[in-house]
Amino acid sequence: MINLVTVCGHNTTMLKHMLSHYKDIVDDIFVVVYLSTDKDKVLFEVTEITKDLNIDIHKTSIEEPFNWTRVTELYNETKLLKPDDWWIVSDDDEFHVYPKPINELIEDCEENGYKFITGAFLDRIGKDGRFPK
C-alpha cells in the first residue's frame, strides 16, 4: 500500500490542491493538523478542505508554532502506524512529480531491495498552475 502523510499548520492555501494532486495515486491519506492553540482557525479550514475531498483528519496536535522537531516527530509517528507500507511524505506546498507511475517505481525498489526513494526539490509551477516540462 501507498500512503500519504502531511502535517499542515498555519497556512492552508495550497492544501486542497496538494491533497487533490495525490488523491488518485495513494491508497490512504493521513492529514495531521498542527495547531498553535485549541481555538486556531486552521482546524476549521482544514476540516472544510478535507471534508470536500472525502478525507478524514488523522490527528490534531497543539504545539508551539514552528517547532520543526515536533513536526518531524509527527511525520514519523504517523509512518509507524503502517511500518511495512510505502509512504509519500509531503508538506502541503509540495507536489511530487515522478518519472513514471509511483506503483512502477515501488515495484522497481522492491525488486532491487531499496527501502526509500529520494529526490530533488525543484520549483516548477507554471503561470497556469501546471507543471511545465
Give the location of each predicted region.
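Active-site-proximal specificity loops/subdomain of glycosyltransferases
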Residues: 38-90, 97
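Short, well-formed alpha-helical segments that are part of the catalytic scaffolds
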Residues: 11-25
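Acceptor/aglycone-binding surface of glycosyltransferases and processive sugar-polymer synthases
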Residues: 126-133
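Conserved donor-nucleotide/metal-binding helix-loop-beta segment in metal-dependent transferases, i.e.
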Residues: 98-126
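Hydrophobic targeting segments
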Residues: 1-6, 21-22, 28-33
